[in-house]
Amino acid sequence: MTGNEKRKKKRYARSVRKRQKKREKQVGEYDDIERVIHPDALFDAFHACEKGVAWKASTQKCHYNLLFEISGSYESLSLRKSIQKGFYCFNLMERGKLRDIASVHISERYVQRSLCDNALAPVCTRSILYSNCASIRGAGLKRSEEVLIRQLRRYYRKHGNNGYIVLFDAKSYFDSIPHENIIADIANLFYDPDIIRLYQEFMGAFDSIHPECQKGRGLGLGSQISQISGVMAANPVDHFLAEIFSLGYGNGRFMDDSSVIVKDKASAVLAIKVVDLLYQRYGLALNKKKTKAVPLNHPFIFLKRKVIVRDSGKIIMTVSYTHLRAHE
């Protein structure tokens, strides 16, 4: 090994140690299972969970015996015992689409809430792009609309409305997310094995609501664990489009719906091929019927909003007519 190669190796080792220390400093505050299962944390998590559902009999019963419930949960979690009580499965019509909901019992829900609020969310959202707006505190549909309008304005100042926006849709997004990939991502973010184990237990519980052939895949709607996992599942694809795909001029995501602005039709076709390959790599599937490239000087629909970019640069965003008909 030459002297130059030795210097490069030492420089790389110093860089790795520096990144490791920075990561430990950022994550260290949340990398502690006691922060998640402490009675005070569980107490706060319960009161956050009961908002909007305090009228339910199960919630009132848990509230009436709250100290006893929290004491039992803390003891079980400290001894690494399971606290799972299965799912309540039902259907719900949301934005004109019938969805299968798998809701957890309130006594398990507040533990999941504590895990998400005191560990997963503060750490995982560090790597989430600003344009990824679903299920993140302070984000939401309004910010997603603002991000899209800002990207369109920035593109218009350079190229006018002569371009394309590629609208992606993931096929059966929550039903196809591989558990192995998400668990590996969480294991890379945390050092505490108990946090990883608890998250793995919650993820493994979804196997009980899926057929045998789908074991190890899919999440259930109605769980906060599902929401943070859904946000993380396609995060590598978003980073690729934002940081490596040089033909893009801005991208956004709201769970299974995402977009990227490109300059011409060839770049749009390439973007679809690239995202299709990346989805396959991470165990997801692109809905090729709903995925399409639309010229920016044509109206398009994203997140149930109809968007028009005028030749003058004026951007008009309204609720789509098809969305209104679904609610009639």
Q: What do the PLM-derived regions correspond to, one by one?
A:
Residues E29-D32, C116-F168, S172-D175:
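Active-site-proximal segment of RNA-dependent polymerases
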Residues Q151-M255, S259-L278, V294:
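Conserved polymerase palm-domain catalytic core
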Residues T322-E328:
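Conserved small/polar residues in nucleotide/adenosyl-binding loops
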Residues S76-K97, R197-H210:
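Reverse-transcriptase-like RNA-dependent polymerase core
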Residues L98-L129, K215-E243:
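Conserved pre-motif C helix in the palm subdomain of viral-like polymerases
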Residues Y282-I308:
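Conserved catalytic core of two-metal-ion nucleotidyltransferases
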Residues M1-S71:
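Non-catalytic, polymerase-adjacent accessory regions of viral genome-replication enzymes
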